[in-house]
Amino acid sequence: MEAIGVLMMCPMSTYLEQELDKRFKLFRYWTQPAQRDFLALQAESIRAVVGNSNAGADAELIDALPKLEIVSSFSVGLDKVDLIKCEEKGVRVTNTPDVLTDDVADLAIGLILAVLRRICECDKYVRRGAWKFGDFKLTTKFSGKRVGIIGLGRIGLAVAERAEAFDCPISYFSRSKKPNTNYTYYGSVVELASNSDILVVACPLTPETTHIINREVIDALGPKGVLINIGRGPHVDEPELVSALVEGRLGGAGLDVFEREPEVPEKLFGLENVVLLPHVGSGTVETRKVMADLVVGNLEAHFSGKPLLTPVV
């Protein structure tokens, strides 16, 4: 398979890059100063694209690669892949489901605790020597809080199971009511937010879920409510979120994702009721290795004429 051209869209895992380089003719797209010229020159050689949640395969790229057979994404979400164009062109698509569920769900619980118990602020308080002059202010407990989840898929369900260990009542909004759960279902996000202390965004990014967290939802969650986003940045109307936090209309937020990563609204930096993470939901050594193996495994299966491990298209 050494002659098969694989286009890696951006830096991802060093391990993934090494494994691809061992098996294929690897092209590193981000290193090319003149990318259009590069594509024109190598178009006949590239049969696979490896992307992630930041850089995938849009219609323009797919059209520029006439020999493209497969897009293997180093992510669960495929919002950076034009699935309709792939179907039209007969291009296969794979992702890395299931393997990152635990890490992302764990992080959601960590964000909830960090916001409610002000863990980051407590750490700063000790480090700057303030404890010597008085105790830190009281915080808010997590146990027993009403947790609402937008999207009860693999990750949403894993968050729910973890929150249950804290005796939290669970409710959810999804495209349809789930038949095999006793969690309370709400038919609108506003209704869910109105009945939640903590609202967790865990759904895929689609045109319908873009800005699913808007002013109406934020106001329904209210000045004691907490928003946790482990989905995608564009799920949240970021200017509305910033305004609500600054004005005290929302109690707090834990954010692993942002609308224009790596850009983050500077107004969030000085707010002690906000915890900000650099999109590290699946960022553990163990999980990233398994994800990389799945990307490589899908490519090897495709080019060996075997069934794909995690087919999407």
Curated annotation (Swiss-Prot):
Any one of the GO CC terms: cytosol
Enzyme class: oxidoreductase
A GO MF term: NAD binding
Catalytic reaction annotation: (2R)-2-hydroxy-3-(4-hydroxyphenyl)propanoate + NAD(+) = 3-(4-hydroxyphenyl)pyruvate + NADH + H(+); (2R)-2-hydroxy-3-(4-hydroxyphenyl)propanoate + NADP(+) = 3-(4-hydroxyphenyl)pyruvate + NADPH + H(+); (2R)-3-(3,4-dihydroxyphenyl)lactate + NADP(+) = 3-(3,4-dihydroxyphenyl)pyruvate + NADPH + H(+); (2R)-3-(3,4-dihydroxyphenyl)lactate + NAD(+) = 3-(3,4-dihydroxyphenyl)pyruvate + NADH + H(+)
InterPro entries: D-isomer_2-hydroxyacid_DH (IPR050223), D-isomer_2_OHA_DH_cat_dom (IPR006139), D-isomer_DH_CS1 (IPR029752), D-isomer_DH_NAD-bd (IPR006140), NAD(P)-bd_dom_sf (IPR036291)
Active-site residues, Swiss-Prot/TrEMBL: 232, 261, 279 (proton donor)
Record keywords, A-Z: NAD, NADP, Nucleotide-binding, Oxidoreductase, Pyruvate
CDD domains in UniProt: HPPR
Sequence positions that bind NADP(+): 152-155, 174-176, 230, 256
Keyword NADP: yes
One Pfam family here: 2-Hacid_dh
PANTHER family found in the cross-reference section: 2-HYDROXYACID DEHYDROGENASE YGL185C-RELATED (PTHR10996:SF178), 2-HYDROXYACID DEHYDROGENASE-RELATED (PTHR10996)
Family: Belongs to the D-isomer specific 2-hydroxyacid dehydrogenase family.
Name of the protein in question: Hydroxyphenylpyruvate reductase
